[in-house]
């Protein structure tokens, strides 16, 4: 039964209506909304007011757009919105919302529309989550559940990608973010998703069946159903046919009680504990380990002892032998930690944490990882591990440098092979031409606009598909060849005007953009021939330079000319995208084109630098040759030399000597260095300057025109391996290794150099090898000596660590003597009976049981006399202590009575003081009431007088009218009587009003007086309750003290048992060694004075008499006489 059973009913609820948020468009007061009436058009002017609204779109030339908002007249709520493109958005519609330009659309359901404070229309939405928005943990749980139910095989990848997750998250966005409507269908089960729509088509249809709670990050079903059926029932195992009695007993019996007598069992456990305590006492280990192992002497030892006794067949001798052997193994454990090891372990824990493998490898190699782990649980309870840490230093938050802009890490690495273009409008594309851009997904060159999405530049169709569905669309007829504009040209070896030396001291040469396209950073494909490996779009050629792998700089060549010159004519239109990219051969063309615009008289100068190196650290880079291209004037070179021109003169600068060989002239410009003085060869640059001049024209012209048309190498061009020596130096020979049919190309590709036999370089190499051999031989000798020394040290340590037979015998003798002494002490103290001692004595201790028995009997007879004297002394001491206890109790009772009397007197004083304060307070209240009454009477009298005066001064309007008539004419008797009657009525009314006012004042005063009396009564009740509680507490304390005193008296009155007296005497003797020595001396003197008798009974009697006298004297010295003690009165 699932957890949704209690929430289910007989009728399923339409969860689609529940999950989609409800809004105020529902009908009110039972009247249906006009939107639901089919007889009238939707949003008719009969029920709705149409209001225009204006908003702006980003990235458009016509930013201001005009839309329409529909307001319902009955409740003045916004029910719909029509955008500038004619899309009508209603409540509960599912829409696409653009939150970010580079991310997919957010799918949400419309809850309502409203105006902001600035009269901008915004839409309230309830968001759906995609699978990429759900946490990985929740998504994995869902996938695991579906895999168990075998749901995934029923769906295709497109269907799973269209799945959404409903939520209750409310968001608000402006209407300018709406990007169209979609359909979100609810399905009860994911297996029914196919019935909703065909998700392989771009029909803007999605489905959902689960609800996502953002607070708990959990996915739950939106459709509650009772899970009944075979799929949801547990598989019950078959009923067991055998009974419990048939099953074999798997418990192991460790001990069977009542197998031996209880006394023997207790003695056996005492002996085992004594053996282990003695064994651990002589061990040298850390306190933490000793404390941990001493726990095994307590209850754990008892368990181990009885288990071993059961395994030995309840033979006490065999069990003790096994336990003793285990104790010896326990003390000789090799994993004990020394103080230095403990310090290293604590240092490793603080620095490396609980990485016990590293601690074992770096700090404690002689301790295994298991030993370190077990020691850690002991170490962490020590004070060193539990001491508080130092307070961390506070860091000023203002000093921390924070990034000015947060960088969001992409979910997947973005390919660096594609170009990054800014957002562009349709007009920008037209200006750039059709070859300016291409889609990174479908390789299309035509699009309405270009925008970034998922880190790629996409066309309109690919971008909208990605924004809607969160994935790139499938391309049926995708071109197999990547467009040229999607590649970024790599820098080639020929791009730099000079090659870096091994030391890296050459400055980076000036680079110019390529003439194939206007964007120098764009990539173009290139195919490599003549034996060079083919490189794909994602591969980049690398080379090894100075021992490290670096990116090989490469740039294209045009017409066999190194692109070292800026483009002269920038107004030429680029090649169309339909033109195939030029085919390059080994980074160079044929060396000459059909239209050669290079005039005669150009000068080309190259410097060749030969750097011999004899460092011990780098053997592979001996005698490197690098060629430095001159960067004074950018000169085009065809295959290393101009084919049409002749080499007139080559200047070779080498070792300061001037030679002339085959047109090569040397001049002394480079200093020499002595090899014998420094044992090294200086870097001697050999500068080869090739100057090519034309006799007809000596002027140079660097204005070149780069043509877009590049011809590939001729298929007839061939090359072969050669061995001709081009020229020689003092220490090297330059050999042309590649002979091309089209002529020489470049010295870096066609020439190699070899070390000349008998030269300085060869000698230095041989000397270097000899030095290496000598160094290696010396190092081997030193290593062998170190190994021999280490082996000798190990042998010495092993010899020192192994004890000699004399030492072993001496240690065993000491251990036997100590153990025998302990057993003798135990026998003398009377802890072990003679029969048990004879049975339990281990065979390795050579002690005569008869002698031990005699000693025990004599000690027992002597102890009887000592016990009698001690009992008499203890009786006297008990009486004195009883008197002292009674006196102390009497004094304590008197002191307690005195304290109680003082407390009662203080309480009486406090009660009298409170009574006086209450009487004074009541008197002040009565005085205050009397004053109030007097003031009230005075005020009433004054008020009456004022009323009378006012009545006398103010006449009734009727009387005023009557007096005016009487002034005009003579007054009659009736008028006078009437006037008098009116005056009497007025006076009577005033008297009644004064009486009513007086009654009200009296009633108010009476209520105030009653309230004060009630407050005083409550105060008296609280005081009485406090006094009663204090009395109860005092009585309880007195009763407790009396009970405690009685218990103490009863405890002191109890007499000491003989065993307690015996133990007390032994304690006194052990605490006072001087008394023990005196007792032994007295016994020796008594034995010397007594006559020699052969009867052992007489010897025992004499010994007992002397021992009793000595014990009496000793007790007198230990306890002073009663007369000497101070008497308490």
Swiss-Prot record:
Instruction: Report, as the record phrases it, the tissue specificity of this protein.
Output: Expression detected in anterior intestine and head region.
Chain intervals with Polar residues compositional bias: 1-11, 525-545, 561-573
Summarize the protein's role: Transcription factor which promotes stress survival and delays aging. Required for cell cycle progression and development of the mesodermal and endodermal embryonic lineages. Required for normal T-cell polarity, for correct migration of QL neuroblast descendants and other cells, for embryonic patterning and for the embryonic expression of hlh-8. Also required for the transdifferentiation of the Y rectal epithelial cell to the PDA motor neuron during larval development.
A Gene Ontology biological process term = regulation of asymmetric cell division
Q: Where is the composition biased (Acidic residues)?
A: 419-429, 613-634, 705-717
GO cellular component terms given for this protein: nucleus; NuRD complex
Primary residence? nucleus
Question: Which residues lie in Low complexity bias regions?
Answer: 22-33, 899-914, 933-950, 983-999
Q: Which Pfam families match?
A: BAH, ELM2, GATA
Per UniProt, subunit arrangement is: Interacts with ceh-6, sem-4 and sox-2. Interacts with wdr-5.1.
Tell me the compartments it is located in.
Answer: Nucleus
Q: Biased-composition ranges for Basic and acidic residues?
A: 915-932, 1000-1040
Listed name of the protein = Egg-laying defective protein 27
Q: How does a null allele present? A: Shortened lifespan and reduced survival in response to heat stress. Impaired differentiation of the Y rectal cell to the PDA neuron with the Y cell remaining undifferentiated in its original rectal location. Double RNAi-mediated knockdown with lin-40 results in delayed cell cycle progression in mesodermal and endodermal embryonic lineages, but accelerated cell cycle progression in a subset of embryonic lineages.
Q: Which UniProt keywords apply?
A: Developmental protein, DNA-binding, Metal-binding, Nucleus, Repressor, Transcription, Transcription regulation, Zinc, Zinc-finger
Q: Which domain of life is it from?
A: Eukaryota
The UniProt comment on domains reads: The SANT domain and GATA-type zinc finger are required for conversion of the Y rectal cell to the PDA neuron.
Residue limits of the SANT domain?
332-384
In alphabetical order, the GO MF annotations are: chromatin binding; enzyme binding; RNA polymerase II-specific DNA-binding transcription factor binding; sequence-specific DNA binding; transcription corepressor activity; zinc ion binding
- Residues forming the BAH domain are 87-223
For the keyword GTP-binding, the answer is no
Induction pattern = By starvation, heat stress, oxidative stress, and UV stress.
Residues in ELM2 domain copies: 224-327
**Which residue ranges are recorded for the region named Disordered?**
1-43, 388-434, 488-636, 693-717, 790-814, 899-950, 982-1040
């Amino acid at each position: 039964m699932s957890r949704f059973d209690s929430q289910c009913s007989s009728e399923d609820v339409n969860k689609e209506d529940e999950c989609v948020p409800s809004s105020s468009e529902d009908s009110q007061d039972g009247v249906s909304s006009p939107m639901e009436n089919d007889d009238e058009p939707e949003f008719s002017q009969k029920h709705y007011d149409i209001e225009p609204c204006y908003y702006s779109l980003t990235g458009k030339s016509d930013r201001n757009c005009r839309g329409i908002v529909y307001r319902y007249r009955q409740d003045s709520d916004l029910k719909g919105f029509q955008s500038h493109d004619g899309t009508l958005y209603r409540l509960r519609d599912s829409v696409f919302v653009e939150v970010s330009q580079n991310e997919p659309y957010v799918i949400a359901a419309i809850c309502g529309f409203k105006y902001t404070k600035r009269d901008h229309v915004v839409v309230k939405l309830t968001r759906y989550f995609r699978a990429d928005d759900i946490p990985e943990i929740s998504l994995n749980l869902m996938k695991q559940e579906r895999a168990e139910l075998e749901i995934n095989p029923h769906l295709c990848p497109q269907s799973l990608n269209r799945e959404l997750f409903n939520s209750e998250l409310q968001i608000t966005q402006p209407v300018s973010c709406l990007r169209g409507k979609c359909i979100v269908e609810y399905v009860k089960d994911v297996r029914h998703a196919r019935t909703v729509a065909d998700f392989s088509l771009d029909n803007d249809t999605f489905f959902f069946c689960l609800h996502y709670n953002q607070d708990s990050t959990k996915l739950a079903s939106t459709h509650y159903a009772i899970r009944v059926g075979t799929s949801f029932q547990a598989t019950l195992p078959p009923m067991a046919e055998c009974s419990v009695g048939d099953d074999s007993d798997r418990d192991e019996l460790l001990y069977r009680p009542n197998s031996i007598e209880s006394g023997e069992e207790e003695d056996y456990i005492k002996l085992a504990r004594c053996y282990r305590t003695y064994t651990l006492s002589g061990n040298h280990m850390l306190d933490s380990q000793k404390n941990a192992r001493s726990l095994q002497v307590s209850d754990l030892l008892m368990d181990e002892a009885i288990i071993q006794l059961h395994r030995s067949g309840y033979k006490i001798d065999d069990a003790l032998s096994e336990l003793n052997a285990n104790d010896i193994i326990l003390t000789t454990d090799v994993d004990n930690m020394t103080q230095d090891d403990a310090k290293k372990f604590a240092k490793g824990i603080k620095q490396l944490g609980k990485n016990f493998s590293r601690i074992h490898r770096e700090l404690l190699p002689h301790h295994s990882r298991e030993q370190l782990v077990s020691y850690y649980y002991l170490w962490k309870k020590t004070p060193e591990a539990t001491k508080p840490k130092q307070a961390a230093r506070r860091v000023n938050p203002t000093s921390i440098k924070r990034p000015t802009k947060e960088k969001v890490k992409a979910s997947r690495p973005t390919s660096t092979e594609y170009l990054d273009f800014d957002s562009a409008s349709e007009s920008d594309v037209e200006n750039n031409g059709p070859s300016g851009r291409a889609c990174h997904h479908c390789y299309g060159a035509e699009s309405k606009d270009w925008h970034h999405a998922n880190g790629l530049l996409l066309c309109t169709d690919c971008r909208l598909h990605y924004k809607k569905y969160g994935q790139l669309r499938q391309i049926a007829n995708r071109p197999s060849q990547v467009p040229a504009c999607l590649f970024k040209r790599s820098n080639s070896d020929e791009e730099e005007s000079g090659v870096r030396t091994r030391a890296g001291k050459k400055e980076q040469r000036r680079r110019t953009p390529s003439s194939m396209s206007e964007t120098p950073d764009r990539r173009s494909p290139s195919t490599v021939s003549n034996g060079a490996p083919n490189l794909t779009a994602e591969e980049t050629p690398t080379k090894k330079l100075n021992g490290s792998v670096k990116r090989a700089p490469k740039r294209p060549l045009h017409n066999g000319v190194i692109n070292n010159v800026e483009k002269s004519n920038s107004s030429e239109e680029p090649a169309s995208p339909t033109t195939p990219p030029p085919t390059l051969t080994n980074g160079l063309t044929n060396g000459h084109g059909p239209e050669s615009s290079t005039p005669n008289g150009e000068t080309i100068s190259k410097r060749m630098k030969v750097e011999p190196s004899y460092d011990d650290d780098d053997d592979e880079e001996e005698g490197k040759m690098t060629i430095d291209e001159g960067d004074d004037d950018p000169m085009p070179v065809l295959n290393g030399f101009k084919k049409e021109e002749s080499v007139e003169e080559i200047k070779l600068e080498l070792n300061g000597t001037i030679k002339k060989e085959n047109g090569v002239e040397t001049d002394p410009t480079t200093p020499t260095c002595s090899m014998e003085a420094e044992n090294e060869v200086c870097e001697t640059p050999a500068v080869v300057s090739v100057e090519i001049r034309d006799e007809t024209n000596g002027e140079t012209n660097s204005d070149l025109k780069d043509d877009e048309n590049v011809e590939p190498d001729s298929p007839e061009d061939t090359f072969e391996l050669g061995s001709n020596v081009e020229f020689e130096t003092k220490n090297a020979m330059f050999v042309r290794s590649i002979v091309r049919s089209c002529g020489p190309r470049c010295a870096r590709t066609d020439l190699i150099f070899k070390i000349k036999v008998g030269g300085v370089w060869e000698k230095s190499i041989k000397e270097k090898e000899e030095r290496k051999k000598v160094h290696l031989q010396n190092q081997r000798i030193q290593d062998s000596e170190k190994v021999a020394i280490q082996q000798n040290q190990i042998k010495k340590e092993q010899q020192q660590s192994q004890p000699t037979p004399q030492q072993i015998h001496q240690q065993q003798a000491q251990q036997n003597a100590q153990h025998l002494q302990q057993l003798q002490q135990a026998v003398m103290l009377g802890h072990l009976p003679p029969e048990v001692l004879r049975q339990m004595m281990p065979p390795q201790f050579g002690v005569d049981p008869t002698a031990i028995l005699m000693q025990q009997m004599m000690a027992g007879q002597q102890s009887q006399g000592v016990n009698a004297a001690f009992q008499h002394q203890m009786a006297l001491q008990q009486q004195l202590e009883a008197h002292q206890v009674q006196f102390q109790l009497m004094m304590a009772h008197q002191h307690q009575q005195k304290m109680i009397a003082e407390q009662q007197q203080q309480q009486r004083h406090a009660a009298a003081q409170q009574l006086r304060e209450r009487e004074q307070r009541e008197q002040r209240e009565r005085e205050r009431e009397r004053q109030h009454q007097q003031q009230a009477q005075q005020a009433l009298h004054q008020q009456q007088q004022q009323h009378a005066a006012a009545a006398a001064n103010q006449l009734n309007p009727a009387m005023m009218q009557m007096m005016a008539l009487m002034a005009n004419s003579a007054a009659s008797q009736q008028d006078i009587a009437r006037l008098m009657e009116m005056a009497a009525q007025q006076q009577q009314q005033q008297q009644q009003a004064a009486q009513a006012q007086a009654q009200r004042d009296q009633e108010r005063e009476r209520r105030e007086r009653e309230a004060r009396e009630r407050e005083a009564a409550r105060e008296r009740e609280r005081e009485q309750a406090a006094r009663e509680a204090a009395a109860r507490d005092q009585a309880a304390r007195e009763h407790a003290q009396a009970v405690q005193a009685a218990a103490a008296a009863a405890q002191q009155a109890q007499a000491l048992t003989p065993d307690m007296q015996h133990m007390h005497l032994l304690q006194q003797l052990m605490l006072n060694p001087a008394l023990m020595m005196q007792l032994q001396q007295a016994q020796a003197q008594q034995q010397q004075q007594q006559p020699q008798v052969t009867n052992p009974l007489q010897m025992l009697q004499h010994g007992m008499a002397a021992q009793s006298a000595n014990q009496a004297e000793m007790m007198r010295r230990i306890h002073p006489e009663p007369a000497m003690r101070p008497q308490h009165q």
